[in-house]
Regions:
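Bimodal feature
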Residues: 50, 64, 176-178
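Substrate-binding/catalytic groove segments of enzymes
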Residues: 82-85, 175, 184-189, 202-204
């Protein structure tokens, strides 16, 4: 099942329209693990779900402590462009400021992350899914909430849309991504959030801890902060790609 097929919207709300093939459409159609299955840490252990998450996105995270909060968002964004074959759009800044480009990686270049970072030619051109995930692993290691927040642009709550991110850069920082949204006749929005966290773990659909009656849906009506199960975000921390 997907986010869209597993979760109904509350009475009085309708899912916002999205363009077929858009990033919003891609997020809404993320495949979920069978209901009740736990999110797994990179070491194979299960994460407790009670009060934290309701479903788990079926994502392979490997056996290293890499796929944390910002990494999950960078991966899902990169996966979107990878399946569209828009490889030149798969690039991320390291904390150092170095821009890691998948278009260079598939030409056989590799990255020396020391100092300000540099490319060096190592192998023949190749563009397999394994190549893509190897590239993303080095991104996970040298990019994070600090660099991602700087790369993104401020977004107003009025213009909030699927694919936007609440992010606080830091060590540690945190980030959650809006993966679905609905609104009522008054134009009031509700939305669904996904996250990974520390240590590396599969991406989860979060429960609303402030209003259990809402299940996995969040509303900012009357709120001054966004309260999620494992982090509180000032509302001005909303960003867009």
């Amino acid at each position: 099942m997907t986010i869209e097929t597993r979760y109904n919207v509350p009475a009085g709300y309708k899912r916002v329209a999205v363009e077929n093939g858009s990033f919003a459409d891609f997020l809404r159609k993320q495949k979920l693990k069978p209901y009740g299955e736990k999110a797994l840490y990179y070491n194979g252990q299960a994460k407790r779900s009670e009060g934290v998450y309701d479903s788990v996105i079926n994502v392979e995270i490997g056996d290293r402590d890499l796929h944390q909060c910002a990494d999950a968002i960078m991966l899902i964004r990169a996966e979107y462009f990878y399946q569209k074959k828009e490889y030149d759009k798969i690039n991320f800044n390291f904390v150092s400021g170095f821009n890691a480009q998948y278009s260079k990686w598939i030409q056989g270049y590799r990255i020396n992350p020391n100092g300000k970072g540099s490319y060096y030619k190592k192998t023949s051109p190749s563009n397999t899914y394994k190549d893509f995930r190897s590239f993303m692993n080095i991104v996970f290691g040298y990019a994070g909430t600090l660099s991602m927040e700087k790369e993104m642009k401020p977004q107003s709550l009025e213009n909030m849309k699927i694919g936007d991110v609440f992010i606080m850069g830091g060590s540690p920082g945190h980030a959650v991504i809006i993966v679905d949204m609905a609104e009522n006749d008054k134009g009031e929005k509700i939305f669904m959030l996904a996250q990974s966290y520390m240590p590396a773990q599969q991406t989860q659909i979060l429960i609303n801890p402030a209003d259990r009656n809402m299940g996995v849906w969040y509303s900012l009506k009357g709120k001054t902060v966004l309260e999620t199960p494992e982090w509180r975000f000032p509302l001005e921390k909303l960003r867009k790609f």
